[in-house]
From Swiss-Prot:
PANTHER family named among the record's database cross-references: LEUCYL/PHENYLALANYL-TRNA--PROTEIN TRANSFERASE, LEUCYL_PHENYLALANYL-TRNA--PROTEIN TRANSFERASE
One Pfam family it belongs to: Leu_Phe_trans
GO molecular function, one term: leucyl-tRNA--protein transferase activity
Entry similarity comment: Belongs to the L/F-transferase family.
One GO location term (cellular component): cytoplasm
Locations listed in the record: Cytoplasm
Family matches, as Gene3D superfamilies: Leucyl/phenylalanyl-tRNA-protein transferase, C-terminal domain, Leucyl/phenylalanyl-tRNA-protein transferase, N-terminal domain
GO biological process: protein catabolic process
Listed EC numbers: 2.3.2.6
Function: Functions in the N-end rule pathway of protein degradation where it conjugates Leu, Phe and, less efficiently, Met from aminoacyl-tRNAs to the N-termini of proteins containing an N-terminal arginine or lysine.
Keyword DNA damage on entry: no
Identification of the protein by name: Leucyl/phenylalanyl-tRNA--protein transferase
């Protein structure tokens, strides 16, 4: 196994099976963040992740963290909160503000560089990247964004400025995603937060098999049209 240097003149990627074991999933470096290359990456279970000042790094870890949306873990305390939720949840109302919120609210330091923000904004303009917003009155208090692959949604990042805001984003999205034919959410690498919400690890090969099938399954017509998904309970 060796790290592959990508060419700027080809958007092809090596097989994810050739990714390094340590660091887990590192597959390639270089290339660019053009829409065509990003879409090629997601179609093959690969995503970019790198720190400011580093070259672009491409990953496909094994195991892979995923969330079956029907298995979202709704704790008793979160259920009580949601039943009296003060939040309004929307879809694709404020993509730029959501990715900016994610970039500026990472305790461990952001990996969302200006280049990443610009690249995913282009994907959003092309209809491939989407945001879920959580509002309290007129204030954006949380949200998440990711990339659609048919009936699979590749979650990229989330943020929260008030209690349970990011959990609310994922909870409401899961319910809506299921209703419109969504089957699986890619969480990339398991962490304590996503694990607490029901995410699990599966072998990379299983994830790639799911991806190959689900990306060919369309969601219900006009699912990604901007709209309100949830209104406050009080």
């Amino acid at each position: 196994m060796r790290l592959v240097q990508l060419s700027r003149h080809s958007i092809a990627f090596p097989s994810p099976e050739g990714a390094l074991r340590e660091p887990n999933g590192l597959l390639a470096l270089g290339g660019d963040l053009s829409p065509a290359r990003l879409l090629m990456a997601y179609q093959h279970g690969i995503f970019p992740w790198f720190s400011p000042g580093d070259p672009i790094l491409w990953w496909s870890p094994d195991p892979r963290a995923v969330l079956w949306p029907e298995k979202f873990h709704l704790s008793r305390s979160m259920k009580r909160f949601h039943n009296a939720s003060p939040y309004r949840v929307t879809l694709n109302y404020a993509f730029d503000r959501v990715i900016d919120g994610c970039a500026n609210h990472r305790d461990e330091g952001t990996w969302i560089t200006r280049g990443i923000e610009e690249a995913y904004r282009r994907l959003h303009e092309l209809g491939h990247a989407h945001s879920i917003e959580v509002w309290r009155d007129q204030e954006l208090v949380g949200g998440m964004y990711g990339v659609s692959q048919g009936a699979l949604f590749c979650g990229e990042s989330m943020f929260s400025r008030q209690e349970n805001a990011s959990k609310t984003a994922l909870l409401v999205f899961c319910a809506e995603f299921i209703r419109h034919g969504g089957k699986l959410i890619d969480c990339q690498v398991l962490n304590s937060h996503t694990a607490s919400l029901g995410a699990i690890e599966i072998p990379r090969r299983d994830y790639l098999d799911h991806l190959a099938g689900l990306r060919q399954q369309p969601l219900a017509s006009r699912f990604w049209v901007p709209r309100t998904l949830f209104l406050p309970r009080k």
